[in-house]
Design a protein with these regions (language model features):
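Surface-exposed acidic/polar loop and edge beta-strand patches at domain peripheries
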Residues: 1-141, 152-348
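Asparagine-centered strand-capping/turn motif at beta-strand->loop junctions
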Residues: 145-150
Length: 348
């Protein structure tokens, strides 16, 4: 076990990359290019602590909301499992955090020179979760297994919440590509600096603005606004076996992205928090771009997820059988590039 920004962690590396995961929360904290030292993943500017040490009476810096225990330890690529979004009032009273207990769980980690295997038991959700990470040059192979410990079939939310941040992420410069098709803006108010038309449906990547003149926002370039907030949901192209997103930093000449099987994760959410949220721990300072691929289009309660029904003909939640298991495989790729690739192929 090693330390990363004051947190208990484990790392593996090869000539090209270093990958670091956190013991508590299981977050993939960095996928760093060793030549430049740049990690495209988001590192919050507030102090990071082990979620098990979070105490609302002593840690007002993380805010007083139901998401405080999550925010106390969040970093990089975090997992949303069993729910994607906030718990109901009753679930919160029973101890369930935003995005599920996995983001505050303690993981057992086995390390070899080229692989990490992480395991956690989720007693509230009655699930177990396992993730194996292997390095292959400039690519990271990630395999996950979810097991249902209960005797009942059940719906399931399962989302990979990948968040990019500076210095890789730059206003008006960082570019994006994705295999999106039909898309929809979050319904209602998402943040204090919303600028997209609430609930509007559109084709990737041109999202309708709130402007009366019918303007659009090209989601293929990070915003250059002083402050902004947005969330859009994107159906991954049904005609493709593999879905992907890729981001490119002209300053570092690095392309970073993920590729996965569309049948596993048919949705991707694009989250923009750009110096907009005033409360702790955000304090109008965070600059993020979240690329959240999973089985659900929107962060919402369990009931809302179930009541939504199919969107654009695509299911909006997953299913796991009694005592059943579900497994997925996906890749993260970090490459030196002179320009953004228009797609991200599945590694051979």
């Amino acid at each position: 076990m090693t330390s990363h920004r004051g947190r208990r962690a484990a790392s593996i590396e090869n000539d090209a990359l270093r990958v670091t995961v956190l013991e508590e929360g299981g977050h993939i904290a960095e996928i760093a290019d060793k030549a430049s030292g740049i990690n495209p993943l988001w590192r919050p500017d507030w102090p990071s602590i082990e979620p098990s040490t979070y105490d609302p009476s002593r840690h007002a810096v993380y805010g007083g909301g139901v998401d405080a225990s999550l925010l106390a330890g969040i970093m990089g690529h975090n997992l949303c499992l069993d729910i994607f979004g906030g718990p109901s009032a009753e679930e919160a009273h029973a101890g369930l955090p935003v995005h599920g207990e996995v983001s505050t769980a303690r993981f057992e980690i086995e390390r070899t020179p080229a692989s990490l295997t992480m395991r956690a038991r989720l007693p509230l959700a009655q699930l177990t979760f396992e993730r194996r990470i292997d390095l292959a040059g400039g690519a990271v192979r990630i395999r996950e297994l979810v097991e249902n410990l209960s005797a009942t079939d059940r719906p399931l939310a399962w989302t990979q919440h990948v968040t990019l941040g500076p210095p890789f992420l730059q206003h008006g410069r960082t570019e994006f590509r994705a295999s999106g098709r039909r898309s929809k803006v979050f319904e209602g108010v998402f943040g204090p600096a919303d600028y997209l038309a609430s609930g509007a449906e559109f084709d990737w990547p041109l999202a309708p603005r709130q402007d009366a003149d019918g303007g659009v926002r090209d989601l293929r370039v990070y915003t250059d606004a002083g402050a902004s907030s947005a969330y859009t949901a994107h159906q991954m192209d049904p005609a493709l076996e593999h879905a992907y997103f890729v981001a490119f930093s002209p300053a570092s000449r690095l392309a970073f992205g993920y590729v996965w099987r569309r049948e596993n994760f048919p949705w991707m959410g694009l989250w923009e928090e750009n110096r907009a949220r005033p409360g702790a721990p955000w304090n109008k300072r965070a600059v993020t771009s979240g690329w959240e691929f999973g089985v659900s289009p929107f962060p919402e309660s369990r009931r809302q997820m179930l009541e939504r029904g199919p969107l654009f003909g695509t299911p909006t939640w997953g299913w796991i059988h009694a005592r059943g298991r579900l497994s997925v495989e996906y890749w993260a790729i970090l490459q030196n590039r002179a320009a953004i690739p228009e797609s991200l192929p599945w590694p051979v």
